[in-house]
């Protein structure tokens, strides 16, 4: 049974089990490191220091994504509220809930908002966000869920019209087959009056895309390298930062940014806790994350395969980013 705690206007359900989550992460780490392309699960990016670095990234001039998404939500928030008339706003992968506040504001102004349900893996961050939202929106009941958006969608409360928000182009961090499965799961749980709001980064000049992940201050590189530090600390690994060069490049075949590190020379890394020795060849990549970029027709095809239809599509003035409203 999930642990629950209740305070005025705030409820927090903890579905994540730390021991199970660790075991799953270790298994995924072994599987991905032994894949055709060596890869670290992106979870390793988000320890305490990594989360702080990511917050810094969102404020960088080169990293346009949150600004463009915010521009869209400010311009079209009233339309989103009018079209959905949502009683409940669900935020998947809530984190610090920045742009989500723009949707909350629009729904509050529209007079329909009753409940906010943020779901995120970080209990500490989620509790802080839940309290902040409860203070800022005293008439809204906050039901926070500590869990994984790929595993705990079934725990989302029903009742009334729901708007499920998946913002920040987080959907681009999923591989195509993962996206298809995830959208299919969402479609199966959506009622006729529910809607899905998704933020997607759009295909554009590769130079601009690569600049967004190769910032002049090197914060993104530091963020990615911190994943090695986290793995060394927790798994007793021997990743040597000096033996890897940072690389974030546009892959035009797959329409994604490929973000990670590349071995400077052949060497072996030992991961004691996993009982694993990894042999790297010279210039062999170690992927840490992908960030897929979309064209409207491509996104609509993927949605249709999951039995979802795009009802509305909004972009910023520069057509850098889009927010899509979908229904079953």
Which ranges hold each PLM region?
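A short, conserved alpha-helix within the catalytic core of class I
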Residues: 173-185
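Conserved beta-strand signature within the Rossmann-like core of class I S-adenosyl-L-methionine
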Residues: 188-203
């Amino acid at each position: 049974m999930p642990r629950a705690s209740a305070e005025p206007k705030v409820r927090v359900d903890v579905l994540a089990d730390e021991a199970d989550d660790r075991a799953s992460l270790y298994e995924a780490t072994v599987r991905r490191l032994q894949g055709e392309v060596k890869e670290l699960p992106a979870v390793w990016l988000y320890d305490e220091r990594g989360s702080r670095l990511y917050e810094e990234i969102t404020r960088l001039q080169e990293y346009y994504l949150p600004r463009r998404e915010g521009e869209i939500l400010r311009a079209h928030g009233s339309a989103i509220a009018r079209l959905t008339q949502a009683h409940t706003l669900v935020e998947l992968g809530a984190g610090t809930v920045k742009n989500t506040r723009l949707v909350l504001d629009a729904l509050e102004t529209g007079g329909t908002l009753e409940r906010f349900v943020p779901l995120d893996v970080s209990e500490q961050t989620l509790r802080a966000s839940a309290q902040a939202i409860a203070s800022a929106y005293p008439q809204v009941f906050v039901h926070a869920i500590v869990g994984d958006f790929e595993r705990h969608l079934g725990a989302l409360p029903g009742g009334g019209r729901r708007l499920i928000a998946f913002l920040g182009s987080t959907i681009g961090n999923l591989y195509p087959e993962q996206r298809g499965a995830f959208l299919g799961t969402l479609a199966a749980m959506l009622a006729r009056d529910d809607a899905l709001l998704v933020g997607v980064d759009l295909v554009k000049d590769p130079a601009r895309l690569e600049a967004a992940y190769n910032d002049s201050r090197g914060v993104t590189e530091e963020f990615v390298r911190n994943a090695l530090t986290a793995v060394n600390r927790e798994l007793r690994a021997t990743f040597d930062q000096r033996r890897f060069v940072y690389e974030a490049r546009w892959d035009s075949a797959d329409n994604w940014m490929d973000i990670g590190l590349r071995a400077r020379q052949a060497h072996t890394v030992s991961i004691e806790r996993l009982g694993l020795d990894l042999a790297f060849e010279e210039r062999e990549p170690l992927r840490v994350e992908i960030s897929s970029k979309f064209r409207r027709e491509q996104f609509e095809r993927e949605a249709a395969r999951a039995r979802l239809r795009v009802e509305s599509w909004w972009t910023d003035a520069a057509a850098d980013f889009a927010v899509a409203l979908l229904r079953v």
